[in-house]
Amino acid sequence: MTELLRCEKISKFYEEGSQSVQVLNDVSFTINTGGLVAIVGSSGSGKSTLLHILGGLDKPTTGEVWINRQSLQQLSANQLAELRNQQLGFVYQFHHLMADFTALENVMMPMLIGKQNKREAADLAEKMLQAVGLQHRICHRPAALSGGERQRVAIARALVNKPALVLADEPTGNLDQKTTESIFELIKQLNIEQNIAFLLVTHDLKLADKLTRRLIMADGVLREAS
């Protein structure tokens, strides 16, 4: 398997007044193409901070991240934005859909940002919404959708550019068990069919156990589950 993501000796400090607070401590690991990886840990352990750094949304104090052999720390702002748009997908606990746009328009957005033709973007967005079982909801705005439907739209948006890696921060945290199971089945299906790698941050140990690899974050230190 091909190495997709490499994270080496990542540490992160935040300044709080005269004190320096360490959130991540010398974190190193890799993910291969098509990997299904979970990171579990208590609140405040550094999981979300790590995910933001891996996605180029935050910078480490020390250390380096590579995606497809490109160092995020060596990219310009424009190059980093292009990499995020083309190679990464993001799913959050809160869907972050734009309230004034339909499900279709929300899913089209990453392609429009990438300057794709509007008609082609609409066609691809509709196909992706069909893939997540929402072909009957494409013209609905987020307020008219259930929590599970909104999260499915968010997943469709994350996947529409066919990223190599999806970073998901508590993607099922606000969902009931039945919806959580359906979301996982969707992730597994897309992983198999499109070889997309997923890195999920979750408190749900049952969900984490279904993935092929589990990492544990505690006090900013990451280790493999035994």
Curated annotation (Swiss-Prot):
SMART domains the UniProt entry points to: AAA
Q: What is its main location?
A: membrane
Task: List GO BP terms, alphabetically.
Answer: lipoprotein localization to outer membrane; protein localization to outer membrane
Q: Where in the cell is it found?
A: Cell inner membrane
According to the entry, every stretch annotated as the ABC transporter domain falls at 5-226
Any coiled-coil regions, as ranges = none
Q: What is its EC number?
A: 7.6.2.-
For this UniProt record, the keywords arranged alphabetically read as follows: ATP-binding, Cell inner membrane, Cell membrane, Membrane, Nucleotide-binding, Translocase, Transport
* SUPFAM superfamilies per the UniProt record, alphabetical: P-loop containing nucleoside triphosphate hydrolases (SSF52540)
What are the annotated GO cellular component locations? plasma membrane
Report the GO molecular function annotations.
Answer: ATP binding; ATP hydrolysis activity; transmembrane transporter activity
Positions bound to ATP: G41, S42, S43, G44, S45, G46, K47, S48
For this protein, the record's CDD domains field holds: ABC_MJ0796_LolCDE_FtsE (cd03255)
The membrane topology term of the UniProt record is:
Peripheral membrane protein
Keyword Calcium set for record: no
> What PANTHER family does the record point to?
IMPORT ATP-BINDING PROTEIN, LIPOPROTEIN-RELEASING SYSTEM ATP-BINDING PROTEIN LOLD
Indicate the family of this protein: Belongs to the ABC transporter superfamily. Lipoprotein translocase (TC 3.A.1.125) family.
Q: How does it assemble?
A: The complex is composed of two ATP-binding proteins (LolD) and two transmembrane proteins (LolC and LolE).
Q: What does this protein do?
A: Part of the ABC transporter complex LolCDE involved in the translocation of mature outer membrane-directed lipoproteins, from the inner membrane to the periplasmic chaperone, LolA. Responsible for the formation of the LolA-lipoprotein complex in an ATP-dependent manner.
Name this protein carries in UniProt? Lipoprotein-releasing system ATP-binding protein LolD
Phylogenetic classification of the source organism? Bacteria, Pseudomonadati, Pseudomonadota, Gammaproteobacteria, Pasteurellales
